């Protein structure tokens, strides 16, 4: 590490920061994907239910009664929100991957002359 120029050390620090950000984005993306899958399954099931069937939903630690129309509306809204969030996370992941690739190339280029 002592033979590495300060500017390369700074780039390595930046690279590590990008890697940590990417890890967080990937974790968030997985969580949103899971929530989206669950919401879509719930929506599918509620659409099969006849009108007038009693439906319950969880609100925090409570379970409350609701009707089909309201449950459908809320789930469709949730699916839409999660899809928007997922798209944003995918864009963020793509940008971070591009930054990582670019920075890795810069580091390799900077270290190449001293490697001989």
Swiss-Prot record:
Heterohexamer of two alpha and four beta subunits. This is Prefoldin subunit beta. Molecular chaperone capable of stabilizing a range of proteins. Seems to fulfill an ATP-independent, HSP70-like function in archaeal de novo protein folding. The keyword Chaperone applies. SUPFAM superfamilies: Prefoldin (SSF46579). Belongs to the prefoldin subunit beta family. One of its GO terms (molecular function) is unfolded protein binding. Pfam families: Prefoldin_2. It comes from Thermococcus onnurineus (strain NA1). NCBIfam families: gimC_beta. GO terms for cellular component: cytoplasm; prefoldin complex. CDD domains: Prefoldin_beta_GimC. It is found in: Cytoplasm.
